């Protein structure tokens, strides 16, 4: 039963944080497309790890966008706390998720190999 509740809380946080990043965080350093890929809230509801994927051409822009998100984590926590009714609002920890970039890289390698075999 608790596992089901944890999943609902994770999805609710993911939806709210995605909405906040897209519509309410007003930082000029946020220039790339940002997607929240996963949220994992601890069982005691003290911490929420937010995994984001940042789509940009260069690593410097990606680093600046991640830093801007980390600086906005206090605002995100406050806003999520106002929208989701919990006893404690978890501390937001933002992590970069490179799984999509890694998958695209692997797909590119597979396509190169298949073209070489033809």
Curated annotation (Swiss-Prot):
Assembly notes: Monomer. Binds 30S ribosomal subunits, but not 50S ribosomal subunits or 70S ribosomes.
Key words, A-Z: Cytoplasm, Ribosome biogenesis
Gene Ontology biological-process annotations: maturation of SSU-rRNA
Broad class of where this protein is predominantly found: cytoplasm
Naturally occurring in which organism (per UniProt): Clostridium beijerinckii (strain ATCC 51743 / NCIMB 8052) (Clostridium acetobutylicum)
Protein name per the record: Ribosome-binding factor A
Functional summary from the UniProt entry: One of several proteins that assist in the late maturation steps of the functional core of the 30S ribosomal subunit. Associates with free 30S ribosomal subunits (but not with 30S subunits that are part of 70S ribosomes or polysomes). Required for efficient processing of 16S rRNA. May interact with the 5'-terminal helix region of 16S rRNA.
UniProt GO molecular function: ribosomal small subunit binding
């Amino acid at each position: 039963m608790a596992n089901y509740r944890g999943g609902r809380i994770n999805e609710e946080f993911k939806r709210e944080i995605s909405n906040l990043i897209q519509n309410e965080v007003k930082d000029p350093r946020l220039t790339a497309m940002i997607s929240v890929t996963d949220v994992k809230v601890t069982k005691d509801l003290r911490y929420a790890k937010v995994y984001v994927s940042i789509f940009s051409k260069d690593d410097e822009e990606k680093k600046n966008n991640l830093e801007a998100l980390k600086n906005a984590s206090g605002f995100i926590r406050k806003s999520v706390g106002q929208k989701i009714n919990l006893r404690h609002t978890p501390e937001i920890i933002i992590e970069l998720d490179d799984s999509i970039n890694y998958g695209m890289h692997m797909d590119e390698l597979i396509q190169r190999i298949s073209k070489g075999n033809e």
